[in-house]
Amino acid sequence: MAGPGGPAAQHGDPQHRDSQHGGSRRGAAAIVAALAGAGTRLMFGVPGGGPNLDVVGAAAAAGMSFVLAHGETAATIMAATCADLTGAPGAVVVTRGPGLASAVNGIAHATLDRLPVIVIADTVPAHQRDRVSHQRLDQAALGRSVAKAALTAGPGQPEQAADLAVRLALAAPAGPVVVNMDPGTRAMPATSGAPAIGPAASTGTAPFTGTAPATGTMPVTDDAPALTRGPAAGGGTLPAPRAGADAAGHELAPLAAALRAARRPVLLLGPGALAHVAAVREALTGSGIPALHTDRARGIMPDSGDEAAGLVTGGTMEWPLLAASDLIVGLGVDPAEMIPAAWDYAARTILVSETSAVAAEAVRYFTGGTALVAPLGAAIELIAAHPHHGGWPPAAGRTAKAGALARLREAARAAPGLLSPQDVVTTVRAHTPPETIATVDAGAHMLVAMPLWEVDEPHRLLISSGLATMGYALPAAIAAALCTPGAPVVAFTGDGGLGMTLMEIETTVRLRLRVVVVVFNDATLSLIKIKQRPAGHGGPAAVGYRPASFAAVATALGAAGAAVSDAAGLASELAAALNRDGPTVIDASIDPATYTAVMDLTRGEAGRHPPTGHHPGTGHHLPTARHASTGT
């Protein structure tokens, strides 16, 4: 009888091949059924040979549309964006080896933005691993390094593996789960250290208990899927919250005491508060309490209202308002969104989170702050019941934001024949309807696009916030157009970011998506150029590209393309694009010299000191330097 490495395995035993194919079809049907049951309606990917073709086929049989992308990271970003917009798990299919490796950046984005994505990959079958090294990677370890968890699904009980993957992805804090499909895996003995899987607590504690083996791997069996835990699986140093309303009040006692004493509180709204939009609006509207939003939380409080005070990123545009406050309260703030700058405000900082993992990270980032693990709904009720004592003037949030945005708009003027990034964003915003969804790539232009693009509803402004990856905007725009049909979609990207996903323009053409791609084209990695020292950092060769016509490339790929160099031309081309049945790429010539002033205003000293020396509308003199926080 031939063993695992014997002739039958090496040359392909027909009976084994038939069994393996049957296991592949069963596993594919199981994962599609679990996704469909959780509300997933689209699947993205770049398939290879092997079981993932069965997954694509099972999706089609179940009425789940498959969207072919040009790159695995782009496909994963599409899946993550659909998860962001719909709440259902995103689904992406990749092949083994290079396919999964190429998806890593997209998986990392989903991990740091806490988005539930099921990444379905082939793997070298266990019975071939002793002999086959072609495309053989330790995919469990690879998944563990960037995802919330990694599963290896064998033929014994694929339904259990599929259900587990979906539950893990959705359990707070949400995140991606890699499922390695191995229909040929034989039963192996289980070992100790297997975590006990159970439903996540309503408070958002870790989705499973127990300790994974030190190596982070577990053998595959016919009875249970192999599981490895990744960096976002849960844990942290803070205890889980007590159950019940009385316990919630106990956990929030420090917040209640701080609110009673505060005269000038400021709220920081993070993505955790997106599940409580109605309650937050009811509590804050008319309260006079300014509310700063993280990137992912934009729209919880409408920008057209009096309370929305702009962005909080850890930069300096928010500094005047926070420096004038006497209490800073964060609701659902995720430190992954904050840039690595010092947090040294004099006001006490209190962060409320529903998961101990996020709270543990918060207490490390917000120096001197207090992190509370408690239901956000209870915290919102507490804020509503403790109105502030009138230390802020009327509409302080609106006034603060208006002043900051006015300074940003006027930070720099473009040279004749070129556009400033401010010109681009304000023109596009002025000529698009309120329900437009904007996606923003990482790069210097995001420092302008994120604050200047105002929204009145959540999920209308999307960015890779935790990972801040380039190459996000176009795949995210594709997903937004598919997952929210009817809403206009605009992608803001730089020449660097578009270069990473250029062929996805063909995807928009093939799918006939009305997506407008606006390229900030200065042939430069402008954000990196600003950070370069005059010597020792590689000079122009490290940050400069040869000028390219993205409008011409778009036309070659079947999209409409237009080059613009002034606001009037941009407005005209935008109007045509919004009425076109298909995608448009607008190639905007940008003056890169304008970014230096933008960087200083948003990340440097200029943001700390408004021209008047006072916070607009507060009447409070601002300190001239940051003070160490006295919070505990």
Predicted regions and their residues:
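Short, small-residue-rich loop/turn micro-motifs
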Residues: 47, 121, 183, 295, ...
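Active-site diphosphate/adenylate-binding microenvironment
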Residues: 28-31, 36-41, 46-58, 400-480, ...
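Short, solvent-exposed loop/helix junctions and linker helices
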Residues: 25, 155, 249, 418, ...
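N-terminal alpha/beta PP-like core and its mobile active-site loop of ThDP/TPP-dependent enzymes
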Residues: 2-7, 17, 21-212, 216-390, ...
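Hydrophobic "anchor" residues on beta-strands that sit immediately upstream
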Residues: 118, 437, 490-491
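Phosphate/pyrophosphate-binding active-site segments
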Residues: 2-4, 22, 180-181, 192-197, ...
